[in-house]
């Protein structure tokens, strides 16, 4: 995601890394001057593999126990995990049930929602178009999709597919997500993100589902196809990913599908929700089986070739696997930077070995992880049907831990579960609307608040009173979402947030004019970027 003049810095960083890598290899494998005054002409390269076949066999043999222990500790309903090594599937197993309380077992053909593991699939699809000359990573989204627009004219004209798919457009994390929760479709969301504020272009990293989607849709528009049909045509069918799709309806139609589960406050699990991510399909709307994803993993490790057939040109598939943006600088001199490619997280060990992966998470009930190490010709896929609690990542981390160290050296389930708990705690609302004042100021007569309000981003809002109770409705025309309003204090009411991004109770703060009627209402939950004010019409 370089947008500044970075070629000088990147050049010297690359040279420094190569020198360090070569020095480490030479010290490990080459003669010393004391032993032999004949110097090597070049450093030892490439870096030797981290694992051998025996190490992989040991880690694979440990997987059953790793998974069973993780599921027992957490109560996770179901999981599927597979390993690819040297272009062969050496492990593919399902554990647990498709839906809690029902007998259907998970197997390698069970279809899961992938959440953000959809992103590396999407970048592979765009890479196919790049390889065919249909689009270029550095072609502008506007040139491919004239409807594309952001709030800054310069960014609108200059943002490339690369900018959008590496999260460096300036769109803030969560932009457009709450529209999706309200039921708005992709066209509506993409046509309204030009109201979202932007942070500095190509300078800031903000993980943005709708920004990523905009980049992928620009490519599909240039190809003259819907995203869903394009995925089928250029990837899923050629790669033999028989169950894979970017249509939520296809997921629902599968009898052998993993229902999604949320963990309740008492620690039990329940299949309460559905999660239709069609609006952001390239970023989060794919569904596939473990067997599909193992073919996808082989394609990545094979540089675009699968079963001897070139599906994506290697030079077009390489950029997604390479650093394109730095999500955050190292926090200490001893730490290392993590990078983002196009739909992939990219990191390197001390000797320069790449580790590439991505996680997916729906709070409503799914968590996934894919990780591969191209230098080791090794990849692992973990799919779960429970909300993100760190298990998907922990299984992959424990597998690699055993491969490298002969045993687990970290309590990965505990460690990663704790991180997820911390992230949720950090998202707690600033105001606890459940803590109603002991002596709240009285509300106006409810008629003061009722009526129609307008908002150019979220659309119309209707406030109604019935049987001494206030409610509001908003969302997609013809299918609005209703919210009950409970009095909190004075002209402030509370309502329960909904959908993937739900965060407990939020506030509806009315401003009442001199005529005794509310002039506007601010919904603080929808006002994160200043777009939550609804004005009386």
Model-derived segments and their meaning:
Residues 51-114, 134-136, 143-144, 150-151, ...:
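Short, conserved catalytic-motif segment at the N-terminal edge
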Residues 95-100, 153-370:
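Short, surface-exposed loop or secondary-structure junction motifs
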Residues 368-371, 376-385, 520-523:
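Short, well-ordered beta-strand elements
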Residues 2, 394-537:
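Peripheral terminal and inter-domain segments
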Residues 14-28:
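Bacterial N-terminal signal peptides
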Residues 28-34:
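Boundary at the C-terminal end of the N-terminal hydrophobic targeting segment
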